[in-house]
Amino acid sequence: VDFAGSDTAHRPMAGRVTSAKIVIAGGFGVGKTTLVGSVSEITPLTTEAIMASAGVGVDDTRQVPGKTTTTVAMDFGRITIDRDLILYLFGTPGQTRFWFMWDELVRGAIGAVVLVDTRRLADCFAAIDFFEHRRLPYLVAINCFDGMQYHNAQDVRDALAISSEVPVVSCDARNRESTKHVLISLVEYVLSMRRSRAVAPA
């Protein structure tokens, strides 16, 4: 697939390297920076800052005790899925006052991962609405904090009222292989959607 804009439904020919942009989104403190850092093969670029008094009354830290930093622009990482596919990861800031940056961050992306904490599902509604409004393919990844999954995938799907076609997977954002599985699942979903469009009657 030429992710730069082609509707071709096949993987690149041997020797040709394709790169694609993926956005990692979700609520405040859900683990986006951790996810990018766990899987990136380069030292991830992070734009975290110490949480300041400006966040008092705005950022709800009750469910993320001990969190003292926040992403103020983006996180950036890179992973080579196989010899002909490189993914560039862009993590969005989770705080609502930084959402004005999202339009630029998603420009050129093939899809998005919406990372969720099942204890705070409402925090991801805005991200889902954003991607659905822009018709950008996305999947929902349940971040299993402390190795625990508080709700199963179908319960989360029902609570978010998302299409049955949208993948819902579980992951541990701290674990490279777990995170890699999420990214591969998204790429496969995007490819499936493009194949479906290619064979659909005009």
Positions of predicted regions on the chain:
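Conserved G1/Walker A P-loop phosphate-binding module
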Residues: 2-64, 78-82, 86-88
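A short hydrophobic beta-strand->loop->alpha-helix junction that borders the nucleotide-binding pocket
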Residues: 25, 92-93, 172-173
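Conserved nucleotide-binding/hydrolysis micro-motifs of P-loop NTPases
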Residues: 29, 95, 119-122, 145-149, ...
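Switch II of P-loop NTPase G domains
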Residues: 68-78, 82-130
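Conserved C-terminal guanine-recognition region of P-loop GTPase G domains, centered on the G4
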Residues: 115-165
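Canonical P-loop GTPase G-domain recognition
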Residues: 146-202
